[in-house]
Amino acid sequence: MSGIVFSTWRDEFIDNRGKPDLEWGKSEFKLPETYYGDTNSKAFIGWDGVAIFDEDIDAVELASQYAAQYQEYSEACGRCAPGRWGGRILYDLLDKIARGEGTHDDVAHLKEISKTMMTTSKCEIGKTVPKPILDLMEHYQEQFNTCIDAQMPSKHYNGDTSYIAKVTAPCTDMCPAHVDIPAYIEGVRDMVFTDSLAATRQTMPLAHTCGRVCPHPCEDACRRTNLDSPISIMELKRLGADYETDHELPWLHPAEPKPLRNDGKKVAIIGAGPAGLTAAYYLGLEGIKVDIFEELPVNGGEVAVGVPEYRMPIGKYQKDIDLVLELEAVSITNNHRVDAARLKELHAEYDAVMLGFGARLSKKVRAANENVNMGGYWGAIDMLDKVNLWHKYQIGSPASNELNGKTVVCVGGGFTSMDVVRCSIREGAKKVIMLYRRDEKTIIRNTTYEEYHEAVEEGVEFIFHSAIEEIFDDGENITKLKVNRFELVPDPNGGRAQLVKIEGGDFEIECDYLIPAVSQALDTQIIPEDWNIEMTSWNSILTNGKDFMTSKEGLFAAGDCEYGPMTIVNAVGQARRAASVISRYIYDGKCTLLDDEIMEDHLNRLRVYDKKEKITGWMPGLPRAESEKLEVNERKTNNKEVNLGFTGEEAISEAERCMRCYYISMVAV
């Protein structure tokens, strides 16, 4: 039957052996009872316990195979004797018992070695591997005794069991691109910055970019937080990329790029933003022909024309772009708008097409008398296009022609709105106000602590719990806004607090420009109507979120067009997965996932980080390093990069705070 036979996961003890079906206990955790498709899991074993789904489990073989995975890892690491030699002994003894050659003294030795590893290993992988093994030895003792007393091998499931393992970390699991964060931090700590960059580019080609403008969700899952404060993970990422650029090194790829295949297979990608570039990179590394079609005259998508120079210098981003375009298999065509008719042509001509275009239509604020054609009404995307095309590429004219000496009101609460208000300051606006429906904590959660406080320092006025009710004009231009105030009223059912309008609390703001930045929408006119593509309730393109195939055979989607407006790192993570699936689909016509990708999904559902965990064996109180920022009076009048990054000494000191929280997980199927 399906269900959990036995579990010690995260100190949850379930033992359903010998119980009637109706009395079986259930787990509160999303354990992988089903591996993939119709394939059920027999067991899951990892850093925080073991879960058994098959009553006929071979516990001895399960423990032995788990130890084998760790032994292979520890041989490659070798940074501490308890981890390396302990892992060797752990595996040798378990393998000996599984072969029917063990003794009870071996069991005693196993327990002793396990306790030594748990208390003296330098990193978490050595400390945690023994836990599920000890659980199996305690609760499946009869199987161990049978192998020893009868000197007979364990059952080995008659040879029909496969063991699939994955090494992860809480930060890696939380990263949408699943970057091997402990590895690149280790490269910084060891001052081998090329190793750091190599670890990043395994799953993240845009190292310059995501070392600067990533919202770093990984830091929310940093175990160091349970001790004092999270590692400055994002800022350490840029060290390797900057080192490569500053020293003019040859491109460092995660693997030697394969020559262009001559089998005629080719993939079209629509959009040269983070999603399109990422998919092209990983397909191009495999030698698969990729043609990118980009509507804009420049490469890079919204990061190029939407993210300001002071946050993401175009020279650095261009290095990430050049890394992709340097590949023999990748080409790009600019000023090429793909409409529905052209998409049909590409779909017929190419073996697969991936949609990777961004959400570039600004949504309205839904206020009375809102007219997008009124003077002073300026969509956030159009405004940022003008700013960045001028400052980065000298295309068009300065936005200061419009904004200098003016009062600007922006409605938003995310990264785009932050870019709007901070750019307005730099373009000479007299007064800049952001209206946001919720509170300060929420805007920080939507963006970053640094982004919000830097905007405040630069003179942006934030008015929280507010929204525009009506827009006034003189027939040609916006003149003022009527703004309502709201208060948060707790939900009596314990849900999210609701915003309730404060009667009589409205007020007026005189302004010259209203720039809505509440969200963006997709231009879905690219999709042929007769394809009847399935869409989400947010009017993005529906996929299953795993292989990124749309309802149209051979058409994939990743990034904004699949999910709606998303962060760069999310787009990278989706596009890397899509590229992996496409690389197999164009040859066998099937959408399949690798075991590593299946395990990624299982671990992400399970959640690797445990915010309730109490950390022992580490000294708290090591302060988080803060990078130097350009002084406010200097930065708010120009577009120089604000975040100057760490010095070498600061970076090494911060990297030394990393606890190297690797874990091994394994599924038996």
Which residue ranges define each predicted feature?
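Glycine/serine-rich phosphate-binding loop and adjoining beta1-alpha1 elements at the start
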Residues: 177-181, 186-259, 325, 345-392, ...
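Feature captures the FAD/FMN-dependent oxidoreductase FAD-binding
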Residues: 261, 266-270, 318-367, 470-482, ...
